[in-house]
Amino acid sequence: MASDELPLLTFADAPAFEAWLAAQPDNSPGAWLRFAKKGASEPTISKSDAIDCALAHGWVDGQLGRIDDAFFKTRFTPRRPRSAWSQVNRQRVERLAAAGRISSRGKAQIDQAKADGRWAAAYAPQSQAAPDHDLETALDAEPTARAVFAELDSANRYAVLYRVHQAKTPDARATKIAELVAMLARGETIHPRRARRG
């Protein structure tokens, strides 16, 4: 099912969303959740609480979208078998497990990630991500790419680092670094560059 065909749901609080998650089949396509912005007339579950509920049930948050001035939406889906884990979500899960909030489906996702190495390979949040030595070396060998990398906005910088981190083998990592450095050397970026103000 395409993401624009998913239902848009509103939950008042965490127990309501948890009850919905518990009733979903393993092959659920997911849903968009509607969240109130500050000052909205209708309160909803907070995005942070919804993420906790989702992780506890083996689901994960994804794409964001605007609804109007009072509400925004986020897509929630069951976690795919090989999907990457973030360090932030790993820490959330550890807190939820300590509180006894992890469901059997959530535990199965965690156990599988630990068994196949995705748990240990969790990626750093954007605020803490930094280039590894192999990427630094490749950038140093290509001054134009280094200059473009130094000027990237935070979204483009993180997009480069994330793609390198997601390479599964040393050969795949080397290939990905070469592709990204060549892209930067051409003055290209993953996301369109934002116009500078001023």
Regions found by a protein language model. Give the residues of each.
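Charge-dense, helix-prone N-terminal extensions
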Residues: 1-198
